[in-house]
């Protein structure tokens, strides 16, 4: 098992690294040239800037049984297709029985935004320590499930 993180603006990198180091699981952080990452534990792969370049690089690296941390539903769907596990930074697991619905909801929301004359969107709410705890608990459960 290896862990791959879509690390562009990912708020859970430090949690992933801490848990992975504790469990002796290798981590690869992938980001584009617009981000600077430093790590004493993880392998860092900087991918040339370009639409979805990091996403495709991550999918090319992952294999069955690996864990992918991403907030991108498309990346999660491709990871599941390769037999990898996928988890959102919120702690929500992407699974074969929920990914189609999530992709459809994303599509509908995108169409609604395009059709609306009001294009202002509120950003996500501020991340809390409870969010981090929820992610860590789900991440640990996922790793244990993958090790069985």
Swiss-Prot record:
It comes from the Bacteria. Belongs to the UPF0178 family. Pfam families: DUF188. It comes from Clostridium acetobutylicum (strain ATCC 824 / DSM 792 / JCM 1419 / IAM 19013 / LMG 5710 / NBRC 13948 / NRRL B-527 / VKM B-1787 / 2291 / W). NCBIfam families: PRK00124.1. Transmembrane segments: none annotated. PANTHER family: UPF0178 PROTEIN YAII. This is UPF0178 protein CA_C2825.
């Amino acid at each position: 098992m290896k862990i791959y993180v879509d690390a562009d603006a990912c708020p859970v990198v430090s949690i992933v690294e801490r848990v992975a180091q504790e469990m002796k699981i290798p981590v690869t952080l992938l980001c584009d040239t617009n981000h600077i990452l430093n790590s004493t534990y993880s392998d860092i792969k900087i991918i040339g800037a370009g639409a979805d370049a990091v996403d495709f690089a991550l999918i090319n690296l992952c294999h069955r049984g690996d864990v992918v941390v991403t907030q991108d539903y498309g990346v999660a769907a491709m990871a599941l297709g390769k037999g990898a596990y996928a988890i959102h930074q919120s702690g929500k697991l992407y699974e074969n029985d929920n990914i189609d619905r999530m992709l459809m909801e994303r599509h509908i929301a995108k169409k609604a935004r395009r059709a609306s004359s009001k294009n202002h969107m509120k950003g996500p709410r501020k991340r809390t320590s409870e969010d981090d705890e929820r992610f860590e608990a789900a991440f640990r459960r996922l790793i244990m499930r993958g090790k069985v």
